C-alpha cells in the first residue's frame, strides 16, 4: 500500500497537489503548520478542504517558534504586504526558514507513518523570489533527510516546472478547477476564492487563471507534455 504526505495550506497549489496525490497513492495524509501566519484562517480552510477531498488524515502542527524567529509581512500584522522587493532582493512576504522547517517536519512525519513520499506545491517557474522554493533547495533537503534518517524518502514537487496557467490546467484535468477556484485560500489578506485582487498572491493566481481560460487547449497541451 502506497502512502504520501502532502504539505497542505489549503491554497491553490497544495490543494492541486492533494487532488493529484489522491489518484496516485492508496493513503494520502495532510500536514498543516500553524506558525501564526497572517491569514490564520488558512488552517480552518485546510481542515475543511482535506476532509471534503478525502484525505486519510489531517494533522495540524504548532510551530509558533518560527513566528518568533522569522520577521515577515506574513508573520507580522504591522508589516503590510508589499509588491516591491526589499534591499536584499526578496519580497517582504518571504518567511526565512519556513520550507526548511516544514519539509524537515513533514519528513519526520513520513518516517512515523511509513510514507515513501512528501509532496509540496513549491514552484520555480512563476518564481516569487523565495529561495526555499527552488528545485536545488528541495533536492538538497531531500538528500539530508535520507542521510539523517537512514531511510528512503522522496520529496515530490509536481508543480515545480509548471506556470500558474498550467497549475490551473492540472486542477481542470482532474475535474476540480471550480472547486479549487471557489474553496481555496491563496490571498495574503485572507479572502477565500478569488481573493482580494490586490496582493501579489492574488495577482499571480488571477493572471494564471485568465491565461488558462483564454487558451485552454494549448495550455493543457503544454501541461500534458510536462507530466
From Swiss-Prot:
Catalysed reaction, written as an equation: 7-carboxy-7-deazaguanine + NH4(+) + ATP = 7-cyano-7-deazaguanine + ADP + phosphate + H2O + H(+)
Pathway noted in the entry: Purine metabolism; 7-cyano-7-deazaguanine biosynthesis
Enzyme class at the top of the EC tree: ligase
Cofactor: Zn(2+)
A GO term for molecular function: ATP binding
Record field: transmembrane: none
Record bears the keyword Zinc: yes
GO biological process: queuosine biosynthetic process
Pfam families given in the database record: QueC
Residues the record lists as binding ATP: 8-18
Protein residues bound to Zn(2+): 187, 196, 199, 202
Name by which UniProt lists this protein: 7-cyano-7-deazaguanine synthase
Amino acid at each position: 500500500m502506497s502512502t504520501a504526505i502532502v504539505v497542505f495550506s489549503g491554497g491553490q497549489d497544495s490543494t492541486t497537489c492533494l487532488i493529484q496525490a489522491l489518484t496516485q497513492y492508496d493513503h494520502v495524509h495532510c500536514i498543516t503548520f500553524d506558525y501564526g501566519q497572517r491569514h490564520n484562517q488558512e488552517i480552518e480552510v485546510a481542515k475543511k478542504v482535506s476532509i471534503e477531498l478525502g484525505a486519510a488524515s489531517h494533522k495540524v502542527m504548532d510551530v509558533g517558534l518560527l513566528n518568533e524567529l522569522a520577521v515577515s509581512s506574513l508573520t507580522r500584522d504591522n508589516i503590510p504586504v508589499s509588491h516591491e522587493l526589499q534591499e536584499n532582493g526578496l519580497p517582504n512576504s518571504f518567511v526565512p526558514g519556513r520550507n526548511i522547517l516544514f519539509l524537515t517536519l513533514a519528513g519526520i512525519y513520513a518516517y512515523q507513518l511509513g510514507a515513501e513520499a512528501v509532496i509540496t506545491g513549491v514552484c520555480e517557474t512563476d518564481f516569487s523570489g523565495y529561495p526555499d522554493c527552488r528545485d536545488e533547495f528541495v533536492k538538497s533537503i531531500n538528500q539530508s533527510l535520507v542521510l539523517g534518517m537512514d531511510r528512503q524518502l522522496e520529496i515530490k514537487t509536481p508543480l515545480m516546472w509548471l506556470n500558474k496557467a498550467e497549475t490551473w490546467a492540472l486542477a481542470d484535468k482532474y475535474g476540480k478547477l471550480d472547486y479549487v477556484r471557489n474553496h481555496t485560500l491563496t490571498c495574503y489578506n485572507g479572502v477565500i476564492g478569488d481573493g482580494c485582487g490586490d496582493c501579489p498572491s492574488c495577482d499571480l493566481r488571477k493572471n494564471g487563471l485568465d491565461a488558462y481560460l483564454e487558451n485552454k487547449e494549448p495550455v493543457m497541451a503544454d501541461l500534458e507534455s510536462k507530466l
